[in-house]
Amino acid sequence: MRWDDFEAACPRIAGIARERFGQDEVVMLGTVRTDGAPRLSPCEVDVAAGRLLFGMMWQSRKAQDLLRDPRLVVHSVPQTRMNPGGDVKLRGIAIEERDPDVRATYREAIRARIDWAPDEPGFHLFSLDVREAIYLRFGEEPVAWRWDDAGGCRELRHPDAAT
């Protein structure tokens, strides 16, 4: 599901994700290496053109992973050990973005954020086709929400909840 459709389907998780990703400007991106092992990499993220976009250096390992096997996991960066903002976790499929208009919109978004943008065609650009989203917050007010296409957006029993 494209990001703008996910925002409509589950505004609760999407809103927190957008806020966190905008604040942190980087996420942890999990890909699958050629040997099948997981690879975890920091990656800048931007929302533009109705998509959650990840720009990567040309021929980087994580980009090569996604070109070969598009499965990925996105995890918000914990703010502190106690992480009062909670964890946002997204699972889905990477879509290589070749459309010149989408790439231009991404470059405008990143330039507005950090006063720099990669030159064409020297970077990879992927968007996330969201398949599952989870938000967990621990502590005094624990929260557990999940979204997937089959079950929609729902609250779960939190792992810290008293039995």
Language-model features and meaning:
Residues 60-62, 81, 142-144:
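Short, surface-exposed beta-strand-loop junctions and turns on beta-sheet-rich folds
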Residues 58-59, 131:
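A generic "binding-loop/recognition-motif" signal
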Residues 24-58, 64-66, 72-78, 86-89:
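Short beta-strand segments
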Residues 3-34:
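Short, conserved active-site entrance elements at the starts or edges of catalytic domains
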Residues 78-79, 130:
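Short secondary-structure boundary segments
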Residues 1-12, 84-163:
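Charged, gly/pro-rich active-site loop segments
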